[in-house]
UniProtKB/Swiss-Prot annotation:
Highest taxon above the source species: Bacteria
Protein function: The glycine cleavage system catalyzes the degradation of glycine. The H protein shuttles the methylamine group of glycine from the P protein to the T protein.
Protein name: Glycine cleavage system H protein
Positions of transmembrane segments: none
GO term, biological process aspect, one: glycine decarboxylation via glycine cleavage system
N6-lipoyllysine: residues carrying this PTM: K63
Source organism (scientific name): Nitratidesulfovibrio vulgaris (strain DSM 19637 / Miyazaki F)
Assembly description: The glycine cleavage system is composed of four proteins: P, T, L and H.
Family: Belongs to the GcvH family.
Length: 127
């Protein structure tokens, strides 16, 4: 399983790419593999304000439904509208085409995991 070293992670299986004063968020390859084929993605609206740890949407698959949690605080500046018609993009390409939201940061993100630390989380949960 691929865990890109240039991203940050949460123990709830979201990934974060910091780009200046914004961050792009999605779910990890491990998360989408556990869920199976996604059938629906519910995302926040552009302009919504998110707090760290706040529920910001959900994903549904053939196997389960799962909430999405914001790993940081800020205002949603973009959502991946392609996912409403093609949720399978998350399965096919979780770190690129399957991104979910872009957030303008209101505070420096804290408590995010490095790729190595996230790999340890995945190893614990995979057993």
């Amino acid at each position: 399983m691929s865990i890109p070293a240039d991203l940050l992670y949460t123990d709830t299986h979201e990934w974060v790419r910091i780009e200046g004063d914004e961050a792009v968020i999605g779910i990890t390859q491990f998360a989408q593999e556990q869920l199976g084929d996604l059938t629906f993605v519910d995302l926040p609206a552009v302009g919504d304000t998110l707090a760290t740890g706040q529920e910001m949407g959900s994903v549904e698959s053939v196997k389960a439904a799962s909430e999405l949690y914001s790993p940081l605080a800020g205002t949603v500046s973009a959502v991946n509208d392609a996912l409403s018609g093609a949720p399978e993009l998350v399965n096919q390409s979780p770190y690129t085409d399957g991104w979910m939201v872009r957030v303008k940061l209101s505070a420096t993100p804290e408590g995010l995991l490095s790729a190595a630390d996230y790999e340890a989380v995945v190893a614990r949960e995979a057993h």
